[in-house]
Amino acid sequence: MNKKETRHQLIRSLISETTIHTQQELQERLQKNGITITQATLSRDMKELNLVKVTSGNDTHYEALAISQTRWEHRLRFYMEDALVMLKIVQHQIILKTLPGLAQSFGSILDAMQIPEIVATVCGDDTCLIVCEDNEQAKACYETLSHYTPPFFFSNK
């Protein structure tokens, strides 16, 4: 994991396990865990993690706002229409080829959707390797992903 991923994981953990009232409080807790960052970086991280301030009674604190499954599906369909180059099964894996620079976005969306057949995604710049448990799981996953492709995608095959 890189520094940002490690920091994000710690922030998610702190938000879910403790009540954090302010950005300064979160920044101090990060520092106690050996991570020193600026307020601007923390603010960007909080936005990327969909952290929102909520009020319950007289208390305000931060929580992670979950993105709905429907929204992730819409996002996947949008990416498939605009950036999918190839979708192919290779034994218990699926190769998803994208326009340059977009494979990690596909991987993040697929991870967030928690498709049961997907064991892991490994993404580079323009290729996302989707690993499934076995060949049957890969076929089922391929069928699921095919529903998000534009109608014309498989017309030449």
From Swiss-Prot:
One GO cellular component term of this record is:
cytoplasm
Q: Which InterPro entries match?
A: Arg_repress (IPR001669), Arg_repress_C (IPR020899), Arg_repress_C_sf (IPR036251), Arg_repress_DNA-bd (IPR020900), WH-like_DNA-bd_sf (IPR036388), WH_DNA-bd_sf (IPR036390)
**Coiled-coil boundaries:** none
Pfam family name, one? Arg_repressor
Q: Which GO terms describe its molecular function?
A: arginine binding; DNA binding; DNA-binding transcription factor activity
Q: Which GO terms describe its biological process?
A: L-arginine biosynthetic process; protein complex oligomerization; regulation of arginine biosynthetic process
Please give the pathway this protein is involved in.
Amino-acid biosynthesis; L-arginine biosynthesis [regulation]
Function, please?
Answer: Regulates arginine biosynthesis genes.
Concerning its family, UniProt says: Belongs to the ArgR family.
- Name the UniProt record assigns to this protein: Arginine repressor
Species assigned in the record: Streptococcus pyogenes serotype M49 (strain NZ131)
Gene field:
argR
